[in-house]
């Protein structure tokens, strides 16, 4: 019984610490969006030098309540239907211009097979073959990445790529892809990171 009590106390302390880390970068924490506790976690070696941008191919969200509901639904689908340990992306960006904690800065996500243990995956909520990413969404991601560098989660010379460059996918959708490929951190030729 004492062992179980210790494990619960440790889990609560860790959850509190992770909430503080998420809040540190103006991120809506998993606790704030009422997310589930991961079944298991593996830790990323930091700083991470690769950011993979994708989209969720779900409805677009514009309100806090709508985005939180979509993030909860994505997590439930990932954990129940796909048997992931947690929600796949490290972070999600809503149409309300807010960033939602997924697996976060510290944990290995489940967003890009073969790259999860060495990258942060950021998913824009919506289908960006049809939806247009707003300036607020793009700035929310830029702000998150700046904070990640400042806090030592991301390497100062990190590179950003699209999900479609690494696996057979249309993700992050052509409209979002056309925006992010203009960024100075953009890596056009991914040969150097494939199967590294």
Swiss-Prot record:
Constitutively expressed in fat body, epithelial cells and hemocytes. Not detected in Malpighian tubules, silk gland or midgut. Residues 1-23 form the signal peptide. Residues 46-173 form the N-acetylmuramoyl-L-alanine amidase domain. Keywords: Disulfide bond, Immunity, Innate immunity, Signal. SMART domains: Ami_2 (SM00644), PGRP (SM00701). GO terms for biological process: innate immune response; peptidoglycan catabolic process. GO terms for molecular function: N-acetylmuramoyl-L-alanine amidase activity; peptidoglycan binding; zinc ion binding. Induction: By bacterial challenge. Disulfide bonds join 25-147, 61-67. Coiled coil: none annotated. Belongs to the N-acetylmuramoyl-L-alanine amidase 2 family. Binds specifically to peptidoglycan and triggers the propenoloxidase cascade which is an important insect defense mechanism. Monomer. This is Peptidoglycan recognition protein. It comes from Bombyx mori.
């Amino acid at each position: 019984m004492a062992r179980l009590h210790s494990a619960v106390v440790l889990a609560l302390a860790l959850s509190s610490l992770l909430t503080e880390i998420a809040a540190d970068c103006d991120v809506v924490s998993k606790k704030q969006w009422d997310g589930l506790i991961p079944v298991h976690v593996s830790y990323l070696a930091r700083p991470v030098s690769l950011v993979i941008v994708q989209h969720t191919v779900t409805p677009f969200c514009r309100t806090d309540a709508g985005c939180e509901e979509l993030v909860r639904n994505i997590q439930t689908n990932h954990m129940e239907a796909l048997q992931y340990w947690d929600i796949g992306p490290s972070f999600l960006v809503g149409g309300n211009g807010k960033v939602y904690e997924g697996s976060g800065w510290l944990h290995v996500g489940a967003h890009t097979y073969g790259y999860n243990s060495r990258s942060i995956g950021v998913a824009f909520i919506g289908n960006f073959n049809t939806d247009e990413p707003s300036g607020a969404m793009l700035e929310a991601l830029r702000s998150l990445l700046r904070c990640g560098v400042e806090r030592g989660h991301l390497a100062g010379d990190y590179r950003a790529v699209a999900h479609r460059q690494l696996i057979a996918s249309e993700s992050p959708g052509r409209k979002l892809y056309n925006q992010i490929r203009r960024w100075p951190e953009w890596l056009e030729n991914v040969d150097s990171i494939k199967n590294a």
